[in-house]
């Protein structure tokens, strides 16, 4: 996708997926505006990775929005009294790492930011193949939110809508790693683990998904 002369707000968590989307946008010559959230997550270390990726790609602007979802919890990512699941990804089950309404909130804020700066796109690292079963990472969710974006702001009503850009939506993690290699994404600077420790736990769903892909690419874990 040619994004030259386009501007994009990228939801940049510091993880593998959002960092790869940032690399794709950079290679496509878009003006990139990064947006991260300090939402009371136990793995706040991801924000350091997000800042590192923003600097690596020399993006136009990078903002961290403080939005404390730990005030009401509801997820093991925002409530440390809840244990992280370590039994591996369970098919047809939404794990307790799901944060209620998180993507809806984040994309809504990104939509406001994008309209304020007259951006053309919102870049999201969601993918429907290698994910933990979250309801807000699926194609039907993205489709419906795009419909909402048409209706919910001035740009949409003037038939110049801000579009949700999801280049990874149909890719598995091995494919995403290939894109990361191809687009100068420093994998060792990204962060996926949910545990909140200084080093990846290797047991949470996010670590397991990443490790499986790493093994297929024969990447050593010390290159995490």
Swiss-Prot record:
<dbReference type="InterPro" id="IPR014729">
    <property type="entry name" value="Rossmann-like_a/b/a_fold"/>
</dbReference>
<dbReference type="InterPro" id="IPR018317">
    <property type="entry name" value="QueC"/>
</dbReference>
<keyword id="KW-0862">Zinc</keyword>
<dbReference type="GO" id="GO:0005524">
    <property type="term" value="F:ATP binding"/>
</dbReference>
<keyword id="KW-0547">Nucleotide-binding</keyword>
<dbReference type="GO" id="GO:0016879">
    <property type="term" value="F:ligase activity, forming carbon-nitrogen bonds"/>
</dbReference>
<dbReference type="GO" id="GO:0008270">
    <property type="term" value="F:zinc ion binding"/>
</dbReference>
<feature type="binding site">
    <location>
        <position position="207"/>
    </location>
    <ligand>
        <name>Zn(2+)</name>
    </ligand>
</feature>
<keyword id="KW-0067">ATP-binding</keyword>
<keyword id="KW-0479">Metal-binding</keyword>
<comment type="function">
    <text>Catalyzes the ATP-dependent conversion of 7-carboxy-7-deazaguanine (CDG) to 7-cyano-7-deazaguanine (preQ(0)).</text>
</comment>
<comment type="similarity">
    <text>Belongs to the QueC family.</text>
</comment>
<protein>
    <recommendedName>
        <fullName>7-cyano-7-deazaguanine synthase</fullName>
        <ecNumber>6.3.4.20</ecNumber>
    </recommendedName>
</protein>
<dbReference type="Pfam" id="PF06508">
    <property type="entry name" value="QueC"/>
</dbReference>
<keyword id="KW-0671">Queuosine biosynthesis</keyword>
<comment type="pathway">
    <text>Purine metabolism; 7-cyano-7-deazaguanine biosynthesis.</text>
</comment>
<keyword id="KW-0436">Ligase</keyword>
<feature type="binding site">
    <location>
        <position position="204"/>
    </location>
    <ligand>
        <name>Zn(2+)</name>
    </ligand>
</feature>
<feature type="binding site">
    <location>
        <begin position="12"/>
        <end position="22"/>
    </location>
    <ligand>
        <name>ATP</name>
    </ligand>
</feature>
<dbReference type="GO" id="GO:0008616">
    <property type="term" value="P:queuosine biosynthetic process"/>
</dbReference>
<feature type="binding site">
    <location>
        <position position="201"/>
    </location>
    <ligand>
        <name>Zn(2+)</name>
    </ligand>
</feature>
<feature type="binding site">
    <location>
        <position position="193"/>
    </location>
    <ligand>
        <name>Zn(2+)</name>
    </ligand>
</feature>
